[in-house]
Amino acid sequence: MHRSLKIFGTLTSIGMVIVLMQGALVTKTESGEGCGATWPLCFGEVIPTNPAIETIIEYSHRIVSGLLGAMVIILAIWAWRKLSHIRETKVMAILAVLFIIFQGLLGAGAVVFGQSHAILALHFGISAISLATVVLLTTLAFEDGKPNPPALIVKKGYKGYILAVFAYCYAVIYTGAYVKHTQATLACGDFPLCNGQWIPMLSGPVGAHFFHRVAGTLLLILLVVALIWTLRKYSHYRSLVWTHILCVILVLTQYATGISIVLTGNELFVAMMHALIVSILFTTLCYIVMILSRNKAV
């Protein structure tokens, strides 16, 4: 059922991952001004002549983002028509279109007008939401027609806790993006200490970096608690158990790559993996929230 939609959704999801990674590469290599202050053209040209590597990185990101923007809109319309009988479809379709447009506008605005570090950090957060909505739309296509799609009965306290962790994860994503855009990635040059101190001066780049460390550590603890709670009370829900196990694996890997960024001097591959893993973690949490919303908590 919906074979073509599944294939297209899968391709769009993969494409969104590529866009997200390209965006991380633009930030890491400081290629955001690779096309000057012109958009959508590059230095006023459709095809820039004798482009520098920063120009290639930035302009290829624009081209792929534009293509994926069109694909997301097509996916949203397609899913709306074929999966409108599923409760989450219309909400996800609307969110997918809104956030991909918002993401594009933020990117264009950053080039033409320049933006504060706070707004630039938001761009990555919006990218994570865009990826999640596309993946969830694709997931709905795969779930449709199955006899027992995940519908869970859980306590209100558990559901509230998961929602809080979900929101907190997004906040941690934002703090990480803020660290990148404020050039605070290596403000603490060692680990677990920060420049030889357990608690450094909490101001400027060092303060931003240290705050992100603490926030990431707390996220790890919260997700481990969520997994233990799930195993103790809801082990009969396989979808809930395995997604929480995946979350803990992802957050542990994310934590390890964060440490590696410091110890390797912000090596490119490690930094890219750090951005990718947290986006997959957020998408997984979005799926958990979606299946928890299908039944009222008791």
Curated annotation (Swiss-Prot):
Heme o binds at residues 61, 123. It is found in: Cell membrane. Residues 1-6, 84-92, 139-158, 231-244, 293-298 are cytoplasmic. It is a multi-pass membrane protein. Pathway: Porphyrin-containing compound metabolism; heme A biosynthesis; heme A from heme O: step 1/1. It catalyses: Fe(II)-heme o + 2 A + H2O = Fe(II)-heme a + 2 AH2. Its cofactor is heme b. The chain crosses the membrane at residues 7-27, 63-83, 93-113, 118-138, 159-179, 210-230, 245-265, 272-292. One of its GO terms (molecular function) is metal ion binding. Interacts with CtaB. The N-half (TM1-TM4) and C-half (TM5-TM8) domains are connected by an intracellular loop. Each domain is formed from four-helix bundles and they align in a pseudo twofold symmetry manner. The N-half domain is the substrate-heme O binding domain and the C-half domain is the cofactor heme B binding domain. This is Heme A synthase. The gene is ctaA.
